[in-house]
Amino acid sequence: MRVFEKAYAKINLFLDVTAKRCDGFHDIKSIMQTVSLSDDLVITAERAEKTEIELSLTIGEELKEFANDSAALSSGSDNIICKAARLYLERAGIDAAVGVQLVKRIPIAAGLAGGSADAAGALRALNKIFGAFTKEELLGLSAELGSDVPFCLVGGTALCTGRGEQIVNLSYTPDLNIVISIGKGRIAAGTAYAALDAVFSDFDGTVRSEGERILPSNGEEADLAKNALQSAGECVFNIFEHSGMKELSEVEKIKQRLRELGANATLMSGSGPSVFGIFDSQKQAEYAVCKLNEAGIFAALAKTVRY
């Protein structure tokens, strides 16, 4: 059987880190939003005597021209798509021959959950083929692959807490014209979190984040987040912009350029270094993409996606 899946990127309209956990991970509070920038997956699978997974990879033209991410991509067993497929089949008790064709358009290691989106797409596709799990079971499986994979599986607009796997759908999706842009640098998530730990004293409570004032932890975060989105169409804050990383200088330059091109709000997404700008109209956003591309900077037009 052959299944086509769109693997949509996400942005963080709000992102705060609330605690460092005993297991070394961090608890977050984030408003995550699915956007139309996507990778494409075509997955074929049929039962076989033993499991074999093959991944073929194509880099999208814009990504190839501006972002130069191809060297960072693996088509081997360490690719998260292969990990997702193997996990699904092992838990389902199925041996299968799986073929995956991936067209990559989401920048890598950019805070856009490109790999997580691909993993979620693989899980959805395999479940359409084999139907081994309920939605709830598939969500539990996705959490084993990474903190952003559960949201990418569910999609839409949501308040995410815990490591990101605790998801509350906000039942409201702002209609936003978005430009996503990224320079040449990349930021590993581990490096970004280590920088935050240094600034916020391992989140022991002695140094407070501005995010707590914007979206306080009072048991009503979901209602507050929904109200903020409905009133302004945005709730922009990202604690990683306060991490002191040297890479933030390039981030700030792109944010400034987006503002010069008419963005009402700009923010780094995830642990960076991708940046998004919110524009009043699609025409303004298209113009910004054109000007950034002319300057040799990766930029892509996106819209919010409703689920």
Model-based region annotation:
Residues F14, V103, E234-F237, M268-S271:
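Short beta-strands and strand-loop turn motifs
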Residues P273-V275:
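Conserved glycine-rich beta-strand-loop-beta hairpin in the small C-terminal domain of fold type I
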Residues L89-Q101, A125-L145, Q282-E294:
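Phosphate-handling active-site elements
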Residues L13, L41-I43, I81, G115, ...:
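Residue-level signal for inorganic ion chemistry
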Residues M1-A110, K128-F133, T173, I182-G183:
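ATP-binding N-lobe of GHMP and related small-molecule kinases
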Residues V154, L159-A265, D280-N293, I297-Y307:
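Conserved, helical-rich catalytic subdomain that frames metal- and/or nucleotide-binding sites
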Residues G131-S171:
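Glycine/threonine-rich beta-strand-loop-alpha-helix active-site module
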Residues I81, A110-L138, F151:
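DPxDG-like acidic metal-binding loop motif
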